[in-house]
Amino acid sequence: MPKFLDAVAGFGVTFGSMFKKPVTEEYPEKPGPVAKRYHGRHQLNRYPDGLEKCIGCELCAWACPADAIFVEGADNTESERYSPGERYGRVYQINYLRCIGCGLCIEACPTRALTMTNDYEMADDNRSDLIYGKDKLLAPLEPGMEAPPHAMAPDSTDDDYYLGNIKPAARDAR
């Protein structure tokens, strides 16, 4: 007799859920809200004048447990300056086939060059398109920014950049 009651209880659960309103998410048309601190796609940030924050130190690659990041640093020159320090990340790649979204690379970055956005739509049917280079990772240029390579802001030092004392400047004066 107890087995019969178990079956009746199961039918009761099914019968009770038949009259509930269905929950349907219309995902592609209306994406749902994302948490504020969601770990989505990575982004390489820039200083307000457009120089890259990445100094090519490779700490993010060392911190990555999935070995998904490849960084090749190079030296800045006065004629070609991409970041305010001595070095910059000449090659920067993140393999999203390997990335586990843990955020350890973000914590390891000494200049806060690498952050994670709320973008989570990265699906693709081609595996090679999921290896993002600097062209896909760099933050877009905002008004007042100049695309590198260019010189540092006038009368500024590396420390001014690291302390956040650089403002977007009109480059017309040069």
Swiss-Prot record:
<feature type="region of interest" description="Disordered">
    <location>
        <begin position="143"/>
        <end position="174"/>
    </location>
</feature>
<dbReference type="InterPro" id="IPR017896">
    <property type="entry name" value="4Fe4S_Fe-S-bd"/>
</dbReference>
<feature type="binding site">
    <location>
        <position position="105"/>
    </location>
    <ligand>
        <name>[4Fe-4S] cluster 2</name>
    </ligand>
</feature>
<keyword id="KW-0677">Repeat</keyword>
<feature type="binding site">
    <location>
        <position position="109"/>
    </location>
    <ligand>
        <name>[4Fe-4S] cluster 1</name>
    </ligand>
</feature>
<feature type="binding site">
    <location>
        <position position="54"/>
    </location>
    <ligand>
        <name>[4Fe-4S] cluster 1</name>
    </ligand>
</feature>
<dbReference type="GO" id="GO:0009060">
    <property type="term" value="P:aerobic respiration"/>
</dbReference>
<keyword id="KW-0411">Iron-sulfur</keyword>
<keyword id="KW-1003">Cell membrane</keyword>
<dbReference type="GO" id="GO:0005886">
    <property type="term" value="C:plasma membrane"/>
</dbReference>
<dbReference type="GO" id="GO:0005506">
    <property type="term" value="F:iron ion binding"/>
</dbReference>
<keyword id="KW-0479">Metal-binding</keyword>
<keyword id="KW-0004">4Fe-4S</keyword>
<keyword id="KW-0520">NAD</keyword>
<feature type="binding site">
    <location>
        <position position="60"/>
    </location>
    <ligand>
        <name>[4Fe-4S] cluster 1</name>
    </ligand>
</feature>
<feature type="binding site">
    <location>
        <position position="64"/>
    </location>
    <ligand>
        <name>[4Fe-4S] cluster 2</name>
    </ligand>
</feature>
<dbReference type="InterPro" id="IPR010226">
    <property type="entry name" value="NADH_quinone_OxRdtase_chainI"/>
</dbReference>
<keyword id="KW-1278">Translocase</keyword>
<keyword id="KW-0408">Iron</keyword>
<feature type="binding site">
    <location>
        <position position="102"/>
    </location>
    <ligand>
        <name>[4Fe-4S] cluster 2</name>
    </ligand>
</feature>
<comment type="function">
    <text>NDH-1 shuttles electrons from NADH, via FMN and iron-sulfur (Fe-S) centers, to quinones in the respiratory chain. The immediate electron acceptor for the enzyme in this species is believed to be menaquinone. Couples the redox reaction to proton translocation (for every two electrons transferred, four hydrogen ions are translocated across the cytoplasmic membrane), and thus conserves the redox energy in a proton gradient.</text>
</comment>
<keyword id="KW-0472">Membrane</keyword>
<feature type="domain" description="4Fe-4S ferredoxin-type 1">
    <location>
        <begin position="44"/>
        <end position="74"/>
    </location>
</feature>
<comment type="subunit">
    <text>NDH-1 is composed of 14 different subunits. Subunits NuoA, H, J, K, L, M, N constitute the membrane sector of the complex.</text>
</comment>
<dbReference type="GO" id="GO:0048038">
    <property type="term" value="F:quinone binding"/>
</dbReference>
<protein>
    <recommendedName>
        <fullName>NADH-quinone oxidoreductase subunit I</fullName>
        <ecNumber>7.1.1.-</ecNumber>
    </recommendedName>
</protein>
<keyword id="KW-0874">Quinone</keyword>
<comment type="similarity">
    <text>Belongs to the complex I 23 kDa subunit family.</text>
</comment>
<feature type="binding site">
    <location>
        <position position="99"/>
    </location>
    <ligand>
        <name>[4Fe-4S] cluster 2</name>
    </ligand>
</feature>
<dbReference type="GO" id="GO:0051539">
    <property type="term" value="F:4 iron, 4 sulfur cluster binding"/>
</dbReference>
<dbReference type="InterPro" id="IPR017900">
    <property type="entry name" value="4Fe4S_Fe_S_CS"/>
</dbReference>
<dbReference type="Pfam" id="PF12838">
    <property type="entry name" value="Fer4_7"/>
</dbReference>
<dbReference type="GO" id="GO:0050136">
    <property type="term" value="F:NADH:ubiquinone reductase (non-electrogenic) activity"/>
</dbReference>
<feature type="domain" description="4Fe-4S ferredoxin-type 2">
    <location>
        <begin position="90"/>
        <end position="119"/>
    </location>
</feature>
<feature type="binding site">
    <location>
        <position position="57"/>
    </location>
    <ligand>
        <name>[4Fe-4S] cluster 1</name>
    </ligand>
</feature>
